[in-house]
Structure formats: structure tokens, C-alpha cells
């Protein structure tokens, strides 16, 4: 992202369109870094655990590496980390969000290693394979976009709603032969 922003600055780009449509997400810390590159100040995202106890808040630290106008494209398949970026851009008034309401995945999961006993062998990895590992993924928190807004189950609502046209592929050979 930083390399692209440096190039945009050298080329005197007048605006940026960030396309997060069909982006299922990614790593929490990477979403925070992308948002930080565009936003001057404020809480970019925060995490809360059970009972609403705040676990972590990520603040803008880079003073917004770029100041050019920003539009973020989203759709119903934009989820998780992409919603962190879109929510920060929208709720901190850094740019406009265009498209459909996003997926609404505001939950944070952690993967815990499990060592299960092997039947008849005491303790150790399952099936006696020392390389085999098991894990348990648990939801441990949810993240909130700026303004302490939960997107879990509701998504990020765009500033400008645009319903995509569903274009069907036409068989031009058949169409021509029918004429």
C-alpha cells in the first residue's frame, strides 16, 4: 500500500478508488495498516470481549499518508477486514463508501492448539502422528468501527447505495445464427 501511495503522490493522482468488492477479509493488523495509511487521526477499530470489556483500540498513527479524495467500493461479499477499512473511512469522514451493505462479519476468532490423547497410548497427538495438529477456533471478541459501531450481522451501510446490474453472458454465435 505504501509503495502504491508513493507512486500516486509522484504521479499527482487526484483521487483513489479502493475496490473492496468481493473481498472476504484478511488479517486484522493489515486492515488497520491500510486504514492508517489514509486516515489522519482517531480510533480506526477497537475490539471488545464478552460483556463489552474493551480489549484493544487501534489509533491512526501515520497522520494519513495521502490526502487525495477517496472512494471505497463495497458489496455484500465485502467482509471482515475489508469492513474494518470501509467502516473507518466512512465513520471518520475520510472518504465515501459506495455500493451495497457489506456482509456483517464483526467477530474475532482465535485458533487454539489442541493435543488430544491417542486411544490406548496415553497422551499425545491423535492417531500417533507427531506432525498432526488439531485446533479449535473460538469467537473471542468482536470489533467495532469508529464511533463504537458493531457491524456484526448488519454490515457497513454505504454512503451511496448502488445495486449492481447482473449481466448475463450472451452467446453471440447463437444470437447471430438466429437472426
Set out the residue ranges of the language-model regions:
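Acidic surface patches and DE-rich sequence motifs
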Residues: 49-51, 128-131, 145
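Conserved functional hotspot residues or short segments at active or partner-binding sites
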Residues: 135, 142-179
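Short, surface-exposed patches at the edges or C-terminal ends of soluble domains, predominantly
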Residues: 62-64, 111-114, 126-129, 147, ...
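Conserved catalytic cores of soluble enzyme domains
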Residues: 125, 138-139
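Intrinsically disordered, low-complexity segments enriched in small/polar residues
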Residues: 109-131, 162-179
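Cleft-lining beta-strand/loop regions that shape enzyme active-site pockets
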Residues: 1-121, 142
Amino acid at each position: 500500500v505504501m509503495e502504491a501511495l508513493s507512486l500516486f503522490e509522484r504521479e499527482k493522482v487526484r483521487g483513489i478508488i479502493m475496490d473492496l468488492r468481493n473481498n472476504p477479509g484478511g488479517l486484522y493488523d493489515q486492515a488497520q495498516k491500510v486504514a492508517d495509511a489514509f486516515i489522519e487521526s482517531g480510533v480506526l477499530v477497537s475490539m471488545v470481549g464478552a460483556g463489552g470489556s474493551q480489549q484493544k483500540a487501534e489509533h491512526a498513527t501515520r497522520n494519513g499518508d495521502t490526502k487525495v479524495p477517496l472512494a471505497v467500493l463495497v458489496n455484500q461479499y465485502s467482509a471482515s477486514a475489508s469492513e474494518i477499512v470501509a467502516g473507518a473511512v466512512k465513520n471518520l469522514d475520510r472518504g465515501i463508501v459506495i455500493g451495497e451493505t457489506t456482509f456483517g462479519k464483526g467477530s474475532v476468532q482465535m485458533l487454539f492448539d489442541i493435543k488430544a490423547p491417542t486411544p490406548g497410548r496415553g497422551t499425545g497427538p491423535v492417531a500417533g502422528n507427531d506432525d498432526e495438529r488439531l485446533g479449535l477456533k473460538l469467537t473471542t471478541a468482536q470489533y467495532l468501527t469508529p464511533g463504537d459501531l458493531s457491524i456484526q450481522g448488519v454490515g457497513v451501510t454505504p454512503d451511496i447505495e448502488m445495486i449492481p446490474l447482473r449481466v448475463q453472458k450472451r452467446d453471440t454465435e447463437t444470437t447471430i445464427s438466429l437472426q
